[in-house]
Each structure stands twice: as C-alpha cells, then as structure tokens.
C-alpha cells in the first residue's frame, strides 16, 4: 500500500504531519488519514508530494521501487 511510503518519506525527511499538511494546504487530520490509508489522496497532492520529496508519483503509489 502506498500510504506506507508516504509515512516513510515523511520520516526520512524529518518532517511532521503538520508540516506536510501546511505544505499541502490541508489540515493535519486530513493528511493523517491519507498517510494511514483511510482516505484517498487526490492526484494533485500526490504530485506536490513527489515534488517535495524529489521522487516520482510512481514511487509513492508503488508502481516502481526506484526512488528517483
């Protein structure tokens, strides 16, 4: 499940859920639901996260194991 990668990327970059939520302009609880897989994350937010983490949307959603 790709939400595990959201968590791992956030932790690897020493960021909090609040920092990511602020970056995405959503509230922390909404982002936490994305990260736990409770709520589906919009494609526009996946793109922003891929840009933030300097990776691809394909990596985040599990279509590749190549981080870059």
Segments (PLM) and residue ranges:
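Short, basic-rich loop-to-helix N-cap that marks the start of a DNA-contacting helix
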Residues: 38-48, 67
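Short, charged recognition helix plus adjacent turn
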Residues: 8, 12, 61-68
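DNA major-groove recognition helix of helix-turn-helix
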Residues: 35, 53, 61-64
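Short basic helix-loop element that most often maps to the first helix and adjoining turn
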Residues: 4-23
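Recognition helix of helix-turn-helix/homeodomain-like DNA-binding domains
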Residues: 25-40
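Conserved hydrophobic/aromatic packing and binding residues within compact polymer-binding modules
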Residues: 6, 20-21, 31-34, 60
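DNA major-groove recognition helix of helix-turn-helix/homeodomain DNA-binding modules
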Residues: 25, 44-59
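Residues that mark the N-terminal boundary/hinge immediately upstream of a DNA-recognition element
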Residues: 5, 16, 42-45, 56
């Amino acid at each position: 499940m790709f939400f595990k990668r959201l968590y791992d990327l956030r932790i690897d970059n020493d960021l909090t859920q609040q920092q990511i939520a602020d970056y995405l302009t959503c509230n922390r609880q909404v982002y936490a639901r994305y990260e736990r897989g409770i709520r589906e994350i919009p494609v526009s937010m996946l793109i922003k996260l891929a840009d933030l983490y300097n990776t691809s949307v394909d990596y985040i959603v599990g279509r590749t194991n190549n981080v870059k």
